Amino acid sequence: MTLGSCCCEIMSSESSPAALSEADADIDVVGGGSGGGELPARSGPRAPRDVLPHGHEPPAEEAEADLAEDEEESGGCSDGEPRALASRGAAAAAGSPGPGAAAARGAAGPGPGPPSGGAATRSPLVKPPYSYIALITMAILQSPKKRLTLSEICEFISGRFPYYREKFPAWQNSIRHNLSLNDCFVKIPREPGNPGKGNYWTLDPESADMFDNGSFLRRRKRFKRQPLPPPHPHPHPHPELLLRGGAAAAGDPGAFLPGFAAYGAYGYGYGLALPAYGAPPPGPAPHPHPHPHAFAFAAAAAAAPCQLSVPPGRAAAPPPGPPTASVFAGAGSAPAPAPASGSGPGPGPAGLPAFLGAELGCAKAFYAASLSPPAAGTAAGLPTALLRQGLKTDAGGGAGGGGAGAGQRPSFSIDHIMGHGGGGAAPPGAGEGSPGPPFAAAAGPGGQAQVLAMLTAPALAPVAGHIRLSHPGDALLSSGSRFASKVAGLSGCHF
């Protein structure tokens, strides 16, 4: 190897980039080998020695000067190769890498390259541009009955959009929250004969214009359900309207039932079974102004005259009805007939039954004939007709007694019974206040004695044992001495 060839090699390595890259690739190989006289053969193309990168030939004087400087700096090489070449090659290798290194990296890079390129070519699933409200609305509108459950809504969305099919469990809660929080969706309970899980969901009829021109890409505004106006009840409703529900007379079926009026817009088209509007409310509120007819019975009862305030000289009026029946009505099968009213102003035999009926009518109802205990003694089968007949005065029965004449009928007024009237004598112990039967004064005449015997008969003992006279007037029947003192106070009877 000559010195000129070494200089040409140095010039070619500095001028051509391709040659520099090849020298870089070969530097590692050269640096790793042990001395040799010649450089290894190059596989790549070589640049011409006499051609510079800019296409100018170096002058001969400059070439000779460079050659002399190289010889002085190197001072010769033991292995036959100048040191400047090795130093410059090492600097070039440590410096900026050439295109050869990039090519080497490119050759080593194609391994993982194709998989990344294949993933880029595969298009991922794109999320649909619809909101959850739009997706739910699509699902409900496509159903035949315009109502779906939560599972049916999710099934429709998964079958139509592959993006939601792959990410199913994540967005199901979002559908549930949108159904509950938006007023445009109405929950419909299941019918009793339709078993299953979950309620139905439908659209509010007033939310039809929620989307612009029927496009689900954009919602016009958030739907808010308008509250129902409060009902205006009648200031003075009639009690009959409150009891009957007011379905026919009120005109507005939702006036008394405001809770059911909220579902009136949905009707039965969506399968909503609503109760009838004519059902009465649980209970009418108390009327602030009671009806005037409410106190009609109380006013009539207050204005009715008391039966015990009849003057002594006038017969008492018959009782008005069954509540004031005779005391002997409980022992027989039929009530006592009303006495005749044509007896005149004089005393008549109807005074005693009327008094007993008026006195006992204020107490509770007696036991029925079937519930009364059987009579004891020989008077158990005593018919009611005999009791009634005993109360009547017998014109011929007064012969055995000296109190009344043959043609005169004894009086049964209060004064006559107590001994203040003619025809009867006072009982022996009446003046001392000894207690006794109230009709003991009538023991003189035969008819009155018969009445007293019948009143004190054992047949009336069970009746007296079962009848509880709780009225203050009971004392009138228990003591004959105190009866006369209380006659004056009977005019103000309060029952």
Swiss-Prot record:
Q: Which GO terms describe its cellular component?
A: chromatin; nucleus
Q: Offer an example of a GO molecular function term for this protein.
A: DNA-binding transcription factor activity
Cite the SUPFAM superfamilies for this sequence: Winged helix' DNA-binding domain
Composition bias of kind Low complexity appears in: 83-107, 329-342
Q: Where is the signal peptide, in residue numbers? A: none
Q: Where is the composition biased (Acidic residues)?
A: 60-74
Tissue expression notes:
Kidney specific.
Q: What are the DNA-binding region positions?
A: 126-217
Q: Where is the composition biased (Gly residues)?
A: 397-406, 419-434
**Any idea what job this protein has?**
Probable transcription factor involved in embryogenesis and somatogenesis.
Which protein, by its recorded name, is this? Forkhead box protein D2
The gene name reads FOXD2
